[in-house]
Curated annotation (Swiss-Prot):
Its main location: cytoplasm. InterPro entries: Adapter_SpxH (IPR046404), Thioredoxin-like_sf (IPR036249). Interacts with Spx. It is found in: Cytoplasm. This is ClpXP adapter protein SpxH. The lineage of its organism: Bacteria, Bacillati, Bacillota, Bacilli, Bacillales. GO terms for cellular component: cytoplasm. Gene3D superfamilies: Glutaredoxin (3.40.30.10), putative protein disulfide isomerase domain (1.10.472.60). It comes from the Bacteria. The keyword Cytoplasm applies. Pfam families: Thioredoxin_5. Signal peptide: none annotated. Keywords: Cytoplasm. It comes from Bacillus cereus (strain ATCC 10987 / NRS 248).
Amino acid sequence: MDKQEAKHINMPSPSACEHKSVEAYLFIDPLCKDCWEIEPFIIKLWLEYGKYFSIRHIVTGKVDGTNASSHKWNKPANIRFVWEKTTSLQGFSCDGKVHMQEASSTPYLVSMAIKAAELQGRKAGSKFLRKLQEYIFLENVSNPDCELLLACAKDSNIDVEEFKKDLYSASAKKAFQCDLKFTNEMHITEIPSLVFFHANSDEEGIKIAGTYSYDVYVQLLKELVKCEIEPEPLPPLEVLLEATQFISSKEVAFIYDCSKQEIERELKKLQLKRKVQMIDVKCERYWKWIAKEKDLV
């Protein structure tokens, strides 16, 4: 792993082809384990190619069970091709006890909570979502209640009082309804799904359903940008840990393309410096940053 002196992750200066910026939309159900497992792919893609695209999380699901019959899927407009495949290639979690009966749809309150957090900004929403997924998949919380959602808000360092106000607000409800409408328009039938569009073009977008190898996402991004793009150097390990706050050895090894053993040697050095705390959860090892949090960008 290359060592760099930079202390922050800064976006590089614009290149000649950046006027063809790309918008990416990640369609998720926060109770779906596959939607959690795709996060390392998104983090790595953002770190290496983030200057070429923006990304938004779109919460899929139904408002309640009574509306299931009226939730129809329309044919997608302006989508060139669809890759339909659902498979987990990397295996970031080995716990098979996630409550799949609840994972098939997103409870209304959880969806509203994510939208409420996003009202404080996309970064706030992403932090809240990751913290929520940690509770769900590492502690097998199958039915998150209001108390747990407030704990997630506190742990993700967003404004808890503002979050309380927004949780049942018309703004959060409207944001969730917009996500549902967009899900319909894009004909999302599998999650996670990632849709890429040119930001300033009427050209068709690209949709990929399921989880693929990292190279597939890079190739699709290059196809949309339509010029040679080079990955930015990955940040120092400490910067990544500080930004994510809580991450597994396997995720870090994937992001840096190193062996798990090599990564854990570096992580244990940081543990000796009291910068991280090692936490073993079931059959996976996680690392919690115990210094002050900084943002990715």
